[in-house]
Curated annotation (Swiss-Prot):
Superkingdom as given in the UniProt entry: Bacteria
GO biological process, one term: translation
Biological role: One of the primary rRNA binding proteins, it binds directly to 16S rRNA where it nucleates assembly of the head domain of the 30S subunit. Is located at the subunit interface close to the decoding center, probably blocks exit of the E-site tRNA.
Entry GO CC: small ribosomal subunit
Entry keyword set: Ribonucleoprotein, Ribosomal protein, RNA-binding, rRNA-binding, tRNA-binding
Family as reported in the entry's similarity comment: Belongs to the universal ribosomal protein uS7 family.
Record-linked HAMAP family: Ribosomal_uS7_B (MF_00480_B)
Subunit structure: Part of the 30S ribosomal subunit. Contacts proteins S9 and S11.
Name of the molecule in the record: Small ribosomal subunit protein uS7
Species the sequence originates in: Psychrobacter sp. (strain PRwf-1)
Gene3D superfamilies in the record: Ribosomal protein S7 domain
Length: 157
């Protein structure tokens, strides 16, 4: 085992509008080139649009629900055994689940065709809440890969 000390996880400051660490983390995922105020405007605008469209009182709870729809439970990792590389299904730890869900939501939103990023993000959040959209599709694809490679689960690390 390495003798280095364990690195402490950084405490992320909650976002100014909702006081939520989850939304602050998502703003950081949406941010490009260090432009945080632009990313905040995009995320808050998207949450407002979705709240208006669907008559939602608590956008933070809605966002948590969307994240839960996108979070992967299992993923595949490459494992080399005797010259062959196997895709071994592994359970995803909670912090990585959330990080992957946020990354997939941000990527899926940026690939949509609406005019502004706030509109794209609002559309993707709406679709993800209904269990459709590119981010949910990505999660299902990862789950399918893990299911297809279930035979190699005895190679776990």
């Amino acid at each position: 085992m390495p003798r280095r000390r364990v690195v402490a996880t950084r405490e992320i400051l909650p976002d100014p509008k909702f006081g939520s660490q989850t939304i602050a983390k998502f703003i950081n995922h949406v941010m490009v080139d260090g432009k945080k105020s632009t990313a905040e405007r995009i995320v808050y605008g998207a949450l407002e649009q979705v709240a208006e469209k669907r008559n939602i009182e608590d956008p933070v709870a809605f966002f948590e629900e969307v994240l839960e729809n996108v979070r992967p439970m299992v993923e595949v990792k490459a494992r080399r055994v005797g010259g062959a590389t196997y895709q071994v299904p592994m359970e995803v730890r909670p912090s990585r689940r959330t990080a992957l869900a946020m990354r997939w939501l941000a990527d899926a939103a940026s690939k949509r065709s609406e005019k502004s990023m706030a509109h794209r993000l609002a559309g993707e959040l709406g679709d993800a809440s209904e269990g459709k959209g590119s981010a949910v599709k990505k999660r299902d694809e990862v789950h399918r890969m893990a299911d297809a490679n279930k035979a190699f689960s005895h190679y776990r690390f």
